[in-house]
């Protein structure tokens, strides 16, 4: 018999190993580990924890800050709501959100309203991360989290060059980038 779903906590199954191998083959670089979660919210929470653990393992335990983006939605859990930029969620749950989260501006500029595909302008918005790193100290920032395409606010595609610029800034400051 076959189960529809089994929580893969501390155990593995043939199908999960097969899927992990297929995913690894389709990703760039030398990805050799896959971590399954039960939903997107849990995936975000896990990614945040992995970032903190990664920096602690490297002797950089002071890296506790996260940078999100305005209008972003990353899930319903506390960490995901904290790094998300949905203003009503932030206002409603402000007293229990994670400290040390800062938000960059969103990438949906007024001139992008009727643009199909990737807008030509706006890549410089990624420089918000550079300014945040200077203001708060890049040595204190664990990761930056963005939706490559923002689905919660109308399927907003980032400007050309934005994600590449964000990657460059993260690399410059040793900040992890979560998609």
Model-derived regions, located:
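Active-site flanking residues adjacent to catalytic metal/cofactor-binding acidic residues
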Residues: 69, 146, 179
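A glycine-/small-polar-enriched, mobile loop at the entrance of the PLP active site in fold-type I
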Residues: 1-17, 150
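Glycine- and other small-residue-rich loops at beta-strand/loop junctions that grip anionic moieties
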Residues: 8, 12, 36, 155, ...
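Glycine-rich, proline-tolerant flexible connector loops at the mouths of alpha/beta enzymes
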Residues: 148-157
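PLP-dependent aspartate aminotransferase-fold enzymes
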Residues: 21-143
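Short, conserved phosphate-binding/catalytic loop or strand-edge motifs used
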Residues: 17-20, 145-147
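Catalytic PLP-binding core of fold-type I/II PLP enzymes
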Residues: 156-179
């Amino acid at each position: 018999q076959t189960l529809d779903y089994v929580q893969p906590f501390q155990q593995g199954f043939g199908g999960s190993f097969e899927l992990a191998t297929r995913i690894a083959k389709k990703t760039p670089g030398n990805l050799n580990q896959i971590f399954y979660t039960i939903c997107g919210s849990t995936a975000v929470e896990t990614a945040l924890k992995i970032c903190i653990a990664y920096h602690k393992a490297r002797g950089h335990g002071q890296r506790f800050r996260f940078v999100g983006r305005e209008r972003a939605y990353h899930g319903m859990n506390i960490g995901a709501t904290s790094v998300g930029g949905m203003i009503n969620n932030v206002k409603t749950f402000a007293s229990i959100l994670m400290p040390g989260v800062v938000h960059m501006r969103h990438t949906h500029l007024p001139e992008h309203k009727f643009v199909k595909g990737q807008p030509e302008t706006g890549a410089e918005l990624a420089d918000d991360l550079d300014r945040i790193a200077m203001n708060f100290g890049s040595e204190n920032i664990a990761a930056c989290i963005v939706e490559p395409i923002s689905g919660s606010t109308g399927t907003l595609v980032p400007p050309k060059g934005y994600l590449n610029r964000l990657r460059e800034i993260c690399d410059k400051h040793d900040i992890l980038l979560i998609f």
